[in-house]
Amino acid sequence: PIVQPYNIFSNTFACMAFAQLAKATGSEEYAEIAKKTFERILARRSNPKGQWNKLYPGTRPMKDFALPMIICNMALEVEDIINDPALIDKTIDESVHEIVDVFYQPELGVIMENLAPDGSLIDCFEGRRVNPGHDLEAMWFLMNIGIRRNDRKLIDKAVEISLSVIKYGWDEKYGGIFYFMDRKGYPTQELEWDQKLWWVHLESTIAMIKGYQLTGNEECLEWFKKL
């Protein structure tokens, strides 16, 4: 089917791929594609879907967690190609702030998938959505940033959030991590909410073993073995 290029996440993965390909081959052409794609992604951050947004205009304005999460990882993957330390640091700083200080809810111990533009909670299906696998994936991204910056405080925070999220998302009756959850415990919009998907557990095992390697936290190792 012919589909308009509405999804900015295709661009982020392409950017990382071309950056790694440029490093592997030394190709300036691939490096230039990575640089231009990186610039376009940053320019589209405030309105990533542009004219192809499916939401009804003027209703439930939201910002999503997925974008700052993937941008912080992308910045790490392309920094050697971009060769602009100030831009990379600024991009990472902004993304880490959004993840840790805005989307993470300490009183709940989880990261929200969607918030109001001002960072407040929204009481609707999308606004109550929790995706434990997404949260845990983001935490090992933050651990990698902590390694790059020699920032033990950030690593410890990522481990703390990881352990909180995996406890929240774990199915105590049957085992495994739920796909989607509702922060108020209501039924979710997604019919597949209780499926135990492979990628969720893959991201979780990475977060747990990386957390153990970096901090020696035995609880991370116990969860890794359990997974």
Residue ranges of predicted features:
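Glycan-recognition and catalytic cores of secretory/periplasmic carbohydrate-active enzymes
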Residues: 1-227
